[in-house]
């Protein structure tokens, strides 16, 4: 199956998160180089048919009254810089999990695989130093990373099965000399 992708952005005046990010970035940069910020949620879905995807993007992934829905990422203007942020593999993505569960309930079919990312369209006269500060402000390296803007062939992730840990027999019975030798 192929990967379906859509982009969802809050319309003005509902884009309160984008306004908050703009304020945070102005404080972090200690300058007025940021003129505007747009926050766009990106959804990648797999194991879903096109009809169900079309239904989901209009009823689950977006709210037509307050959201603008795009099939392709909006093109950045000349003075706009785009930063995409996604959760690290293994980190729980509540937005994606909630979307997946809702789609399964709505379609009464197999649960689709969903990945989400957040795209920040930052408009202004930004230096490379500003961009690095913005990355440090918007990306918590413990849980997230910079995401690719390219559409993947698949969103399914395979992980190697880790080796079993070594079993230490008699460890609990070691005295101080035994613990020192074990070190």
Residues covered by each model-derived region:
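Core nucleic-acid recognition elements
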Residues: 1-183
């Amino acid at each position: 199956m192929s990967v379906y992708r859509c982009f969802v952005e809050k319309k003005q005046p509902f884009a309160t998160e984008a306004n908050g990010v703009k304020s945070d970035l102005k404080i972090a940069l200690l300058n007025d180089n940021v003129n505007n910020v747009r926050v766009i949620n990106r959804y990648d879905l797999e194991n879903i048919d096109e009809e169900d995807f079309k239904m989901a993007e209009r009823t689950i992934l977006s709210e037509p009254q307050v959201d603008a829905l795009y099939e392709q990422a909006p093109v950045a203007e000349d003075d706009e810089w785009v930063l995409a942020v996604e959760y690290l593999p293994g980190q729980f993505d509540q937005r994606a999990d909630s979307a997946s569960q809702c789609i399964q309930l709505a379609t009464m079919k197999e649960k689709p695989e969903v990945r989400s990312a957040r795209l920040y369209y930052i408009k202004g006269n930004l230096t490379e130093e500003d961009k690095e500060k913005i990355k440090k402000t918007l990306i918590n390296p413990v849980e997230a990373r910079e995401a690719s803007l390219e559409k993947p062939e698949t969103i399914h992730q395979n992980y190697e099965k880790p080796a079993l840990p070594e079993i230490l027999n008699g460890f609990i019975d070691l005295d101080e000399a035994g613990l020192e030798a074990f070190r």
